[in-house]
């Protein structure tokens, strides 16, 4: 009888260990690296992603109030075009957004598009850094591709994009720096106009005739 009880206890311990082993191993790994992410930090990171999604929804819907609602009143902005590294304020940012609304339609952010080997658009914290290792999610890096349609010409425009956003204690964007090829957008529009404004003569499409604007039928 004692032997049976002993075996029963061993079985219970084994089952309990099996159920909790993965969690325990995770804790051990965290202790070895010194990186322990709290549930509060995880929740804060997810809230920041939701805030950025509201930001991009404001672009798509051309809703300036929705978009600016996630920006702090004292927000600072470093724009994608080089301006001597001059930091702009929230008024300048609002004016730039309004200009995009006036110039483009269907402004859409495609999360993670353009990355190689990963589709994770959002990153925070720093395990490997020139500074100190930390798990603070307040500074978030975002990667993706913006797509839109030029209102005047209907030209489709795409731009690979990278942004660094710092969130304040209220969960709003307090500092915003972004990088993209602004001049490349103008080039895409001009190329579209050049191709679609060409009027072919009666020889276009005929054998032996080379049309630089319609290489698919040459």
Segments predicted by a language model, with ranges:
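C-terminal motif of bacterial Sec signal peptides marking the signal peptidase cleavage site
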Residues: 15-18
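Sec-dependent signal peptide hydrophobic core
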Residues: 5-11
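C-terminal and inter-domain tail/linker signature
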Residues: 4-5, 20-218
